[in-house]
């Protein structure tokens, strides 16, 4: 429901209130943690509206099985997706290995669907705004590359 509101109410309001380039090719969504997961779901389900997604430290663990089904069922037009995770977000090296595996699995599935994906493992990156701020100079040029 939230993403329906974003697509059908918030984006039209932004486009009517501000001078924007309204087309899909200029429209992206980004978020961190649960917001990163929502950005990923949004580009999967509203790919006719969004061509870019920045998914910073997406909260993947509890929804991975459902996400696998979503990835299998989706079709993507030309899309750019930035996926990041920090090495210091995890409590152990085993957890880091699982987190890295999940992000690379998603990367592989998105690539098979035709998306351009930038998987970024932030060395010493934490699950906080300070780390995500450092990732923006990497993510934005990729997402808005012409």
Where are these regions (language model features)?
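Non-catalytic cap/lid and distal C-terminal segments of serine-dependent acyl enzymes
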Residues: 1-146
């Amino acid at each position: 429901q939230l993403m329906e509101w974003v697509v059908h109410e918030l984006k039209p309001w932004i486009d009517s209130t501000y001078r924007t380039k309204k087309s899909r090719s200029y429209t992206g969504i980004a978020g961190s943690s649960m917001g990163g997961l929502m950005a990923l779901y949004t580009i999967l389900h509203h790919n006719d509206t969004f061509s870019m997604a920045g998914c910073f430290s997406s909260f993947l663990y509890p929804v991975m099985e459902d996400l696998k089904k979503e990835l299998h069922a989706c079709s993507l037009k030309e899309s750019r997706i930035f996926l990041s995770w920090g090495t210091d977000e995890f409590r152990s090296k085993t957890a880091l290995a699982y987190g890295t595996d999940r992000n690379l699995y998603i990367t592989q599935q998105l690539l098979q669907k035709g998306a351009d994906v930038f998987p970024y493992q932030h060395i010493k990156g934490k699950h906080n705004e300070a780390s995500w701020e450092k990732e923006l100079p990497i993510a934005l040029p990729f997402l808005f590359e012409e």
